[in-house]
Amino acid sequence: MAKERIYELAKELKMPSKDLVNMANRQGMGVKSHMSSVTPDQAQQLRQLAKGGQKTTNNQHQPVKKNDGHNKQNNHQAQNHNQHHDHDKTQNERPQKKNNSRSNNGTKDNNQHQNNGGRFGGSLNNDQGRNGKRFNKKNKKNKKHNKNKRLREVAHKQPTQRKDKPLPEVLEYTDGMNAQDLGKILHRSPAEIVKKLFMLGVMINQNQSLDKDTIELLATDYGIEAKEKVQVDVSDIDKMFEDEQNNTEHQVTRPAVVTVMGHVDHGKTTLLDKLRHSHVTEHEAGGITQEIGAYQVHYNDQLITFLDTPGHAAFTEMRARGANITDITVLVVAADDGVMPQTVEAIHHAQAAQTPIIVAVNKIDKPGANPDRVTEELAKYNLIPEDWGGDTIFVKISAKFGKNLDELLDMILLQAEMLELKANPDQNAAGSVVEARLDQGRGSVATVLVQQGTLHVGDPIVVGNTFGRVRTMTNENGRRIKEATPSTPVEITGLNEVPEAGDRFVVFDDEKTARAAGEERAKRAMDKERQKTSHVTLDNLFATMKKGQMKTLPIIIKADVQGSVEALSQSLQKIKVDGVRVDIIHQAVGAINQSDVTLAEASNAVIIGFNVRPTAVAKTLADSNSIDIRLHRVIYDAIEEVEDAMKGMLEPVYKEETIGQVEVRQIYKASKVGTIAGGMVTSGKITRDAKVRLVRDGVVIYEGELGSLKRFKDDVKEVKQGYECGLTIENYNDIKEMDVIEAYKMKEVPVK
C-alpha cells in the first residue's frame, strides 16, 4: 500500500497536524513535518492513539460540568463573576488541547473563584482598575489563539493540492545546467530538484552547475529519458553556409553565375556592355542605369547572372576567403593578339577555382585575326576544343558588332544545364559579398549574391565579421525590391561595418542571435589578427609534412627567360619525398608582381624567382602576408634547396636582408674611376659596406660590391632615404639611367 502524508491523516482525524507530528515523534517514528510520509502500519497506530486520546478528553469534560452545576449554589457575587467569565469564554473559545490541559484543574479553579468571591464583589470601576490590565492581556492572547485556530480550520477544510505540469518525455540538456535550468524544463521548482538530488545523495544548491552524470541520474529517478543537446556555434557561419548549401529539399533550378575574364584590351568590357544593353534594356522600360558590378541577362526565358569583377586579383582574393561564387568562367581572348600574360593568369585562377571555362575568341572581324592560332596556344594549358577531341567550348565572337553573342549565351545555358545548378528558395538566405564600400549618405553598402534561400528586407543578417538588419535592398538598376531569390545580385544597406569582398553571409531567425554571432566573429577576427597564421615556407616545410598537413608543395616560378622557366619547372616536378610532390600552379617570365603574391597567398604556395626580383609593391605585400619568396641565380641551387627542405635537411642559412634602393638619375664618366652613378635613395638607406645588385626592368644584371659612396664630394658611410648620392660599383661600368641599385646584407638565420 502507498504511504500516507501526515497532513492527510490529521485531516481524517480532525486534529492539528502539529499535534499529530508530536504524537508520531513520541512513538519514535521520526516525522519531520506535516509533508512527511508514514507507512500504513504507522498510520493505523496513530489512528488508535488519536481515538483513545479523544475518549479520554471527552470523559474529562464530565467533572467540569458537574462542578459547574454545583457552583450555581454559590453567592451572588461569585455567580455574577461566573456569568461574566462564561460570556468571555463564549467569545474567545479555546481549542480542545487547552481544554484538556485545564480540565483536570477545573474544580480547583472554580474553588478559587468561590474562595475569592469577595474579591470580585467590588464595583465595576474597581474591577477595571485593579484587574483590567490582566483581562486585556488575556483577551489579546485569546484573540491571537482564535486566529490561529481559524487558519488551521481553513487549512484542514481546503488542503493545498499542488498541480504539477506533466513531465516531458525526453529531458534535453546541456552540460553545466543548474537546478533552475532543469526546473524550467521539467516544470518543477528548483527547490524540488535540489531535494530530489539530496535524496539521491547529491548535495547541491540551485545555482550550482551539474555534470552529465548527475543530470542523467535525475532523469532516471523521474522515469524519463535524458538526451544531451548538441550545442551549435552560432558564430560559425561557414558551417551554417555549408549546411544551407547541402540542403536538398525543395530545390529548384537557379540561374548560372558567370564571370568574364581576360587580358587587357581583349574586349572584356565591350562584351559585358554589349550583353547588358542588348539583353537588359529590352526588359527595362526607359533604359537602365547600372548601379552595381553585377547584373542579370534575360535570354530565351532564362536568366544568366554576370559578375563584373575589377580584375584577376579580386577574383583570387574572393577565393582566398573561401568564396567560390562563380559557376562558369568566360575567357575572352583576342584573335589578333592571341594568348597574353594576363590570359595565362586568368586560366590559372579559373583552374584553381575548378570552374568550367568557355573560351570566347573575340575580334574575329579585325584584319589579321587568326582564331586557329588562339586554339593552338590554349591547347598548351589543357583547353582543347571539342573539335579536337577535348571538352572545352570555343565560341568565335565580335563583341563590337554583337556577332555570335546569342551563340555564346546558348553555350552558357547549355553548360549550366549540364552542371544542374539548383537551390532551395524556401530557406534562410545565404550567399557571398561581391563588393562593398562606405557611402557617406547610406553608410555601409554591400553588393551580395544570394546563393541559397530568399533574402527579404528586414532580415537579421551576419556578413563576415559584422552584422545588421537589411534596411534597403536594390537591384542592378537602382530600383528597390523586397526580396531576392537564388543567384540574384542585390545591393543592401544596414550593416554595422563594411565587409570584405568574398565574405559569406547568413540570415538568422532573430536579431538577438545575429548580434551575438556577429560580435563573437568580430572578437575572433581580432584575436586571429594578433596571432597571424604563417604560410608554408621552405624553412617550416618539413615540420608541416611530418604533421601530415601537406601532400603537395604548391610553387610559383618566375624567371628571366622561358627556357629557364621550363628547365626549373621540369626539374622541380621530378622531386618526390615521402609521398609529397611539387605542384607548379603558375609559371611565367618577368619580375615577381603583386598578382603572383596574391595567388601564392590564396594557394599557400612558395614563389621561386630565377634571375628576377619582386617589385616594391609585391615585396611589401609578401612581407605583410608572410609569403616565402626564394631568389636564385643558379638553377641547381634552387632545385637542391627545395629538395633539402622536403627532406628536412636544411642547415642554417644566410638570408638576404634588403636595406635600401637607389634610383639612378644621371651618369658621369671618369677616366680613372669609370662610370659614376648619381641617384636618389628612394627607400631605406645605402651603406658603404653593403653588397649591391643592379636591376634593370625587373631583371638582375649584376651583383657585386660598392666601389665608393659619396655625398657632395665627401666619402660617407651611409646615405638615408630622400637624399642624393654618388656611387660606383666595383669592377662594373655598364650602368644606365633609371636602373635600380639594391643594397643588401646577408644575415644568418637558423632553420625554424
From Swiss-Prot:
Residues 26-167 are annotated as: Disordered. Residues 308-311 are annotated as: G3. InterPro entries: EF-G-like_DII (IPR053905), EFTu-like_2 (IPR004161), IF2_II (IPR044145), IF2_N (IPR006847), P-loop_NTPase (IPR027417), Small_GTP-bd (IPR005225), T_Tr_GTP-bd_dom (IPR000795), TF_IF2_bacterial-like (IPR000178). Residues 398-400 are annotated as: G5. Residues 362-365 are annotated as: G4. Residues 34-47, 101-129 have a biased composition (Polar residues). Residues 253-422 form the tr-type G domain. GO terms for molecular function: GTP binding; GTPase activity; translation initiation factor activity. Residues 262-269 are annotated as: G1. Residues 287-291 are annotated as: G2. Residues 83-96, 151-167 have a biased composition (Basic and acidic residues). Residues 131-150 have a biased composition (Basic residues). It comes from the Bacteria. GTP binds at residues 262-269, 308-312, 362-365. Pfam families: EF-G_D2, GTP_EFTU, GTP_EFTU_D2, IF-2, IF2_N. PANTHER family: TR-TYPE G DOMAIN-CONTAINING PROTEIN, TRANSLATION INITIATION FACTOR IF-2-RELATED. One of the essential components for the initiation of protein synthesis. Protects formylmethionyl-tRNA from spontaneous hydrolysis and promotes its binding to the 30S ribosomal subunits. Also involved in the hydrolysis of GTP during the formation of the 70S ribosomal complex. This is Translation initiation factor IF-2. It comes from Limosilactobacillus reuteri (strain DSM 20016).
